[in-house]
């Protein structure tokens, strides 16, 4: 008997898209530029990136004391890794943080995996729309361009640029102009510390008619 089709009435959740060619190439270049060997920092970074869904890694040697390594994760969207992703990476490198050499890490090396701490950004602004632009679509476009910017700087920059957010909004579909932008109630850059990643929170937009 040949099964031609199969359906599932329940929605599937918790999965990640297959690794893109671009992500694979970046991981390949990383391996060439930062050779992993004998459980060094680059090795832990490589092991974490081998797990589907991981988008970025920070490594902190001796984070929990002697013979320990802290591995901090973001996902492929630049968001702090959730518990399921953290657990898969933990199991891959050092199951249960026991240092028994049952994962990729060598015997006696205790690895502690966690997701980054979220730094939520609340945005408020006035937007002038282009003629015939629909507010709902413009709101979605604004959120998308800001999210893309935050993803691009996750784990690579220690601040969120107020000017870059303003510029990104101006490039959003349907936006003619933006004014009065505040980020977390201010008109300044937002500092991002180690083990942190910026995430987009509430976005409040006041609309005015375009010229």
Predicted features and spans:
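A generic structural micro-environment signature
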Residues: 12, 34, 38, 60, ...
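A broadly tuned preference for mixed-charge, low-complexity surface segments
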Residues: 20, 112-132, 170-190
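Carbohydrate-recognition loop of C-type lectin domains
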Residues: 36-158, 210-211
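An aromatic-glycine-centered, glycine-rich loop/turn in mixed alpha/beta architecture
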Residues: 137-211
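Periplasmic/extracytosolic POTRA-like scaffold domains at the N-termini of outer-membrane
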Residues: 10-40, 142-165
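Short, small-residue-biased leader/transition segments that mark boundaries at the very start
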Residues: 1-3
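Short linear motifs in intrinsically disordered/low-complexity regions
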Residues: 9-11, 83, 190
